[in-house]
């Protein structure tokens, strides 16, 4: 296929292309004008595709050296030259073998005649340093693609830390029949989810097998870690862990908390190492209930205290709804109620109600004008009491 840009006119502003003419062939790949001058790379972004002339010379020398070496090997084997189209390497626009088709392929170039063999052997010595330099330059500029393996996922830490010796029973691991320790319980795939306090969540233990013997037995240190939370580390038992089954741990109590139930106390007593008839689900449920107690309902609001009694008059009597009228018995000296009397004993204790003085019209009080000579309403009377 002909090069569509083979006879294009070069830009005239470049000093390296001052002598270019419309008839001069220009490569559409690297901008070199017939092997003369310096490459301008005007059609490439600056700084992206700008190899040096030395790199091109090294690549061309390596191509020639490898092509000659394969031709000599083919000729020495007596196979003759192959002119098949599929056995030839790809040719770039300058008629040279492509570098990517040469290493490791079966493509061959036509053998040269005996007359040119002496000249090629003489050039082998000159091209050997350039070929070595070209190989190093190609490996540096075009490194092979390596598959970056993902970093291995770190194994999770053991869910249960080993208990100190002598504190929570024996901490030795169970041994299988072949003498190897049983690592089934330490495998992260067989461990239930852990909440923030380290206890197993009961939802993950519904399908667990009943604790028995062999590899299914949890050691004492793990059982103790499941049943005892961080804030309930100290427990006291009345029977010291003696007995078996449901008879154990009935006297378990926590400092500062309410007495534990029979289920939680039984699971807590399992850290002594002899209780084997409790399932992990029951033990985890009791531990979860201890470490995460249910939210209690809000207490009933305390009723507000009764308001203070209203102050009536200058003496501050208790009953604010009375004391608006004078006590007739007190006037006669026969009232024995004292301060608890619902009427006022004098105008000093009388509670003033301005609404009671509306409607008198300024007329004199009829009770004062009568024979008894006093008014039971006192200061609250709507009539006039002699200038008051």
Swiss-Prot record:
Zinc finger (C3H1-type): 321-348, 359-388
Pfam annotation, one family: zf-CCCH
Residue spans of biased composition, Low complexity class: 260-274
Signal peptide residues on this chain, from the entry's feature table: none
Xref: InterPro entries: Znf_CCCH, Znf_CCCH_sf
Compositional bias per record (Basic and acidic residues), positions renumbered to this chain: 61-109, 181-193
Protein name per the record: Zinc finger CCCH domain-containing protein 47
Organism (species): Oryza sativa subsp. japonica (Rice)
């Amino acid at each position: 296929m002909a090069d569509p840009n083979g006879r294009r006119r070069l830009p005239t502003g470049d000093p390296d292309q001052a002598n270019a003419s419309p008839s001069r062939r220009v490569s559409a790949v690297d901008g070199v004008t017939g092997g003369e001058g310096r490459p301008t790379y005007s059609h490439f972004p600056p700084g992206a595709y700008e190899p040096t002339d030395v790199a091109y010379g090294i690549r061309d020398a390596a191509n020639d050296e490898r092509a000659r070496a394969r031709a000599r090997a083919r000729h020495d084997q007596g196979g003759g030259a192959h002119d098949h189209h599929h056995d030839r390497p790809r040719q770039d626009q300058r008629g040279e073998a492509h570098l990517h088709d040469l290493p490791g392929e079966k493509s061959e170039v036509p053998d040269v005649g005996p007359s040119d063999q002496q000249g090629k052997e003489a050039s082998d010595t000159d091209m050997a340093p350039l070929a070595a330099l070209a190989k190093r330059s190609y490996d540096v500029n075009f490194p092979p693609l390596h598959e970056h393996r993902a970093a291995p996922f770190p194994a999770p830490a053991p869910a249960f830390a080993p208990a100190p010796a002598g504190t929570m029973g024996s901490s030795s691991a169970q041994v299988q029949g072949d003498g190897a320790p049983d690592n089934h319980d330490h495998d992260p795939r067989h461990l239930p989810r852990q909440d923030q306090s380290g206890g197993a969540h009961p939802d993950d233990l519904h399908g667990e097998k009943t604790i028995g013997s062999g590899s299914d037995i949890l050691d004492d240190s793990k059982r103790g870690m499941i049943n005892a939370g961080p804030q309930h580390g100290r427990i006291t038992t009345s029977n010291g862990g003696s007995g078996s089954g449901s008879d154990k741990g009935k006297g378990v109590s926590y400092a500062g908390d309410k007495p534990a139930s029979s289920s939680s106390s039984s699971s807590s007593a399992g850290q002594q190492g002899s209780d084997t008839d409790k399932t992990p689900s029951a033990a985890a449920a009791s531990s979860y209930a201890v470490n995460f107690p249910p939210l209690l309902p809000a207490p009933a609001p305390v009723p507000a205290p009764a308001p203070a009694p209203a102050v009536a008059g200058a003496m501050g009597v208790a009953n604010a709804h009375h004391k608006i009228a004078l006590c007739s018995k007190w006037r006669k000296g026969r009232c024995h109620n004292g301060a608890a009397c619902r009427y006022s004993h004098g105008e000093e204790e009388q509670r003033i109600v301005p609404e009671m003085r509306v409607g008198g019209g300024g007329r004199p009080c009829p009770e004062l004008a009568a024979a008894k000579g006093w008014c039971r309403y006192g200061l609250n009377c709507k009539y006039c009491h002699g200038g008051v």
